[in-house]
Design a protein with these regions (language model features):
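Long, contiguous alpha-helical scaffold regions
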Residues: 64-184
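N-terminal cysteine/histidine-rich coordination modules
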Residues: 1-76
C-alpha cells in the first residue's frame, strides 16, 4: 500500500537497478503479495544484465487480519524498541522476522494457531536430540500438524537428505505452559 523503489546492486556483475516494493502489505487487499512472501519471491529480483537472482530486504509491515498477526520484516540492525507503536492493535500477535527464509515458516506456524516461540524451542530440543544421535541437521523447519494424531511435524534437512519427524503435541503444551504469556 505504500510503494518505494529499492536500489539493488547485482553481486555477480555489479549492475545497479531498482525494484518497486511496498512497506505496508495488507493481505486482505493484496493477496498476491502474500503469495510472493510465501513463495520467497517478494524480496528478490532478476538482474537485467546477467539474469542472476538478487536477494534484498527492506523494512516492511505485513498485516494478516484473518489470522490476527503482524510481521515486522526488517534486518536485526534496523529494529527499534518503538516499532511496536507502528500498529497498536492489541488483539494481534506481533512478530519480528529478520530473514526472508523465515517469513513462510512464521506465517504457517501462526496461521496453524501455534505460538512460534514454543515451536522455536521444540526445534532446538529436536536439534539437540539429533546431535546426541550423531546426526547433524543443517536445517529444521516447521512443516505441519495433525491435531487428531497429537503430533507436530518438522522437516529435517541433513547433508544426507531430508526426512520428516513428528514430535508429540504434549511437548508443545508443556513448553507453552512455562512460557510467559504473550501479550501481543
Amino acid at each position: 500500500m505504500k510503494s518505494i523503489y529499492v536500489a539493488l546492486t547485482c553481486r555477480n556483475c555489479g549492475y545497479q537497478t531498482h525494484k518497486q516494493s511496498e512497506t505496508l502489505i495488507l493481505s486482505d487487499f493484496e493477496p498476491y503479495l502474500k503469495k510472493q512472501l510465501i513463495d520467497e519471491t517478494y524480496f528478490s529480483a532478476i538482474c537485467p544484465c546477467c539474469k542472476n537472482k538478487i536477494d534484498f530486504l527492506h523494512p516492511c509491515l505485513f498485516v494478516e487480519k484473518k489470522y490476527r498477526y503482524i510481521l515486522f520484516i526488517k534486518a536485526k540492525h534496523d529494529q527499534k524498541a518503538t516499532d511496536h507503536l507502528l500498529y497498536q492493535e492489541k488483539a494481534y500477535c506481533k512478530r519480528y522476522v529478520d530473514n526472508t527464509t523465515k517469513i513462510k515458516e512464521t506465517m504457517k506456524i501462526l496461521e496453524d494457531g501455534y505460538d512460534d516461540r514454543a515451536i522455536a524451542i521444540m526445534k532446538l530440543k529436536l536439534l539437540l536430540h539429533l546431535r546426541k544421535q550423531e546426526k547433524h541437521p543443517v536445517c529444521i523447519t516447521y512443516f505441519d500438524s495433525e491435531k487428531e494424531q497429537s503430533s507436530i511435524w518438522f522437516k529435517v534437512k541433513t547433508e544426507e537428505g531430508e526426512e520428516m519427524m513428528a514430535v508429540h503435541m504434549q511437548i508443545y503444551d508443556n513448553i507453552l505452559n512455562i512460557l510467559p504469556k504473550d501479550d501481543h
